[in-house]
Swiss-Prot record:
SMART domains: BTB. Coiled coil: none annotated. It is linked to The gene represented in this entry may act as a disease modifier for autism and schizophrenia associated with recurrent deletions and duplications of chromosome 16p11.2 region. Induction: By TNF and IL6/interleukin-6. Residues 1-22 have a biased composition (Low complexity). Expressed in a wide variety of tissues. The keyword Nucleus applies. Belongs to the BACURD family. It is found in: Nucleus. This is BTB/POZ domain-containing adapter for CUL3-mediated RhoA degradation protein 1. PANTHER family: BTB/POZ DOMAIN-CONTAINING ADAPTER FOR CUL3-MEDIATED RHOA DEGRADATION PROTEIN FAMILY MEMBER (PTHR11145), BTB_POZ DOMAIN-CONTAINING ADAPTER FOR CUL3-MEDIATED RHOA DEGRADATION PROTEIN 1 (PTHR11145:SF18).
């Protein structure tokens, strides 16, 4: 006799199937983000930790990426505090906002900062600012060297201040045609212009390494002076008096080779510690005396100025008895 089970059905056994994965990342709600209030006129922006509070009108006034974000084309989410998060450096975002608000901004002087601002302008698609940054960078690249500025000495005090304020060697040209008491020789005007032209050429070539000064108020007619570490090292005077048969004349020379030599010699004073004594000796410097004479007169030799004068023509009757003509001391 078979017995048939009766009663309520047995409880269903637990399912052995694994739960199906949803395949979706956690939604914005999981991070506490919510849509931007559609009717709001103001927006709070958190750009890489830099906080900004601005209006929708500013953000949507120009055709940029920010206009695409806040004109309703895409959904913009905010955090619990109502801040819109933008994962970007906020260093130049204030400049971006100012450009969107005003249409122009002062650009940074640094080439590096200009490049950074250009990168941000490209990211936010601010076309006008992109063009301004590119133009500024191009102008900086075209400026190959700094301006060649030549101070004009107006007083001995100003000259001393200029010499004390620079660490560069100094080349000074004094030219003052009004100092002449006599007529000039036929070649003097031409030679004076040659001295001025050579000074300008040297200034254009060496203005990055030397300070060039012009003096138009001094007592000489044409004289070059060379300074190193605040003191005069050499001097080349280009004028002399020619005694003709019946009248005196002023003669201006153009000792081009000597001027070039002294200009190159003064370059050894570029280093703060001064020139090497062996180098001074090789170039005929003031400290370049022989080893036997490097005793008690060493300091005097180091501070002696090389003065080179052009030949001075003197008649026999006007030369005092026993006077010798000295061309270099």
């Amino acid at each position: 006799m078979s017995a048939e089970a009766s009663g309520p059905a047995a409880a269903a056994a637990p399912s052995l199937e694994a739960p199906k994965p949803s395949g979706l990342e956690p939604g914005p709600a999981a991070y506490g983000l919510k849509p931007l209030t559609p009717n709001s006129k103001y927006v709070k922006l958190n750009v890489g930790g830099s906080l900004h509070y601005t209006t929708l009108r500013t953000l949507t006034g120009q055709d940029t990426m920010l206009k695409a974000m806040f004109s309703g084309r895409v959904e913009v989410l905010t955090d619990a505090g109502g801040w819109v998060l933008i994962d970007r450096s906020g260093r130049h975002f204030g400049t971006i906002l100012n450009y969107l608000r005003d249409g122009s901004v002062p650009l940074p002087e640094s080439t590096r900062e200009l490049g950074e601002l250009l990168g941000e302008a490209r990211y936010y698609l601010v076309q006008g600012l992109i063009e301004d940054c590119q133009l500024a960078l191009q102008q900086k690249r075209e400026t190959l060297s700094p301006l060649c500025l030549i101070p004009m000495v107006t007083s001995p005090r100003e000259e001393q201040q200029l010499l004390a304020s620079t660490s560069k060697p100094v080349v000074k040209l004094l030219h003052n045609r009004s100092n002449n008491k006599y007529s000039y020789t036929s070649t003097s005007d031409d030679n004076l212009l040659k001295n001025i032209e050579l000074f300008d050429k040297l200034a254009l070539r060496f203005h990055g390494r030397l300070l060039f000064l012009k003096d138009v108020l001094g007592d000489e007619i044409c004289c070059w002076s060379f300074y190193g570490q605040g003191r005069k090292i050499a001097e080349v005077c280009c004028t002399s008096i020619v005694y003709a048969t019946e009248k005196k004349q002023t003669k201006v020379e153009f000792p081009e080779a000597r001027i070039f030599e002294e200009t190159l010699n003064i370059l050894i004073y570029e280093t703060p510690r001064g020139p090497d004594p062996a180098l001074l000796e090789a170039t005929g410097g003031a400290a370049g005396a022989g080893g036997a004479g490097r005793g008690e007169d060493e300091e005097n030799r180091e501070h002696r100025v090389r003065r080179i004068h052009v030949r001075r023509h003197i008649t026999h009757d006007e030369r005092p008895h026993g006077q010798q003509i000295v061309f270099k001391d």
